[in-house]
Amino acid sequence: WLLRRDGQSTIDLRVNCIPTIFGDDITMRLLDRDVGLMSLDHFEFQPREYDLLVSVLRRPSGLLLVTGPTGSGKTTTMYGCLQFLNDGSRKINTLEDPVEYVVKGIRQSQVNPKFGVDFPELLAACLRQSPDVIMIGEIRDPKTALTAVRAANSGHLVLATMHSPVAVKAIRAMVTFGVHPQNFAESLIGIISQRLVRKLCQRCRQRIDLPENDAFLDDVRPLLPHDWTPVLYEPGRCEECHNVGFTKPICVPEILPFDTELRRMVADCRPLVELDRAAHGSGMVTFRQAAMTRVALGQTTLQEVMRVVPFDDLRELEREEWEEPLRSAIRSASHSDGNGQPTAAL
């Protein structure tokens, strides 16, 4: 349903209902169509993150994957990328399930599996429309994966989402779909894996001392402003945030642009651990850097980072060197406030 509020925006209301032994279980999802259409400038990306993403989007062709679990903001990021590309110089087609936001100047199509029109069929038809940019709502089957790679290798810029916890694991997911590693490597220009953390209310956040052992911030110090003050923050309470301490969610992205060496490793089916190490050396923005930068700038808390970062997957990639220092920092920070006084653990 569409709910139009007098003098305000239009709300898209989606209702799902299933029967239970206690009665109907109803879930409602609200989408504010105006709020959802944000340009990349409003994503609060850090300068290096923004520059990396824009450098990928400026490529004339190739495949950009946006990955993460359900509710991690993938669709919002995709629309932000489309807004950046939608300057009138390109023909842009989207394949969505469903179309969540109507974007002027973009040709948007919606899948309808009941009538045999799913992503593979729509994508095949879309390629005959001579698009410059194709956005695929989700790669969830082998046929869509194969066609997306073929489109990216034939001169189209293809943006697609899929479920993958960290950037390099999207490679394994695509190969599992039956995509030939050589063809996939030739198409790949970047992978973004992301999570959402709650942003601290900037009006009532409470200052706390930086723990004595602040090694968990070592590799993000070069990314911070020169006048950065070494303090952290925890949530407070005020009317502006309805006494929650947090406001809107913000994106924590892991951004991996692909260069010649990384493509060679994908084509050679190198182990994910090796790919991940090479990605670190190629200039990717890691979850650690993105998350800790937002903590250091007072945008979120250490606890929020621990809540959303996929540590199990990072351990599999042998990226576990920051989990225990982070836990230690939380323990230290939870016992003192900005005046050196003890405070309750959060």
Indicate residue ranges for each PLM-predicted region.
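Short, flexible helix-loop junctions that flank or precede catalytic/ligand sites
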Residues: 1-346
